[in-house]
Amino acid sequence: MALAAVKWAISSRTMLKHLFPVENGALYCVGHKSTYSSLPDDYNCKVELALTSDARTIVCYHPSVDIPYEHTKPIPRPDPVHNNEETHDLVLKTRLEEKSEHLEQGPMIEQLSKMFFTTKHRWYPRGQYHRRRRKLNPPKDR
């Protein structure tokens, strides 16, 4: 198995040397396309292949091609007045309405007072009168 892998590596290296001839210098660019390409012919890039001088690395250069303005299309913008589709605001409003229906505080406070054997007043928030009288910066202990 290992012998077959070594033979394949050697044969692929010699094959690459024949496909991409190396001249003096570190890199030689080949101007022709390879016979096999997974990209369609009208794809917007020019592919150039190169092989380094030590024949260990294949370099692929594919800059994107500029597309003429005549071949582009504008982004469709729907009319906001006559658009019947759901907008982001409508979706948020419906979600908030659904959440507010589930948050009823009446039975929740009664259930809490029965569970912990307390009065209902314990579970309501403290009023502004009590919050105002609380010291904001209590003195530190010595």
UniProtKB/Swiss-Prot annotation:
Domain of life of the native organism: Eukaryota
Name by which UniProt lists this protein: Large ribosomal subunit protein mL42
First and last residues of the transit peptide: 1-32
Subcellular location: Mitochondrion
Gene it is expressed from: MRPL42
Name of one Pfam family that matches: MRP-S32
Organism: Bos taurus
PANTHER family: LARGE RIBOSOMAL SUBUNIT PROTEIN ML42, MITOCHONDRIAL 39S RIBOSOMAL PROTEIN L42
GO cellular component: a single term: mitochondrial small ribosomal subunit
Family: Belongs to the mitochondrion-specific ribosomal protein mL42 family.
Keywords, comma-separated and alphabetical: Mitochondrion, Ribonucleoprotein, Ribosomal protein, Transit peptide
Quaternary data: Component of the mitochondrial ribosome large subunit (39S) which comprises a 16S rRNA and about 50 distinct proteins. Component of the mitochondrial ribosome small subunit (28S) which comprises a 12S rRNA and about 30 distinct proteins.
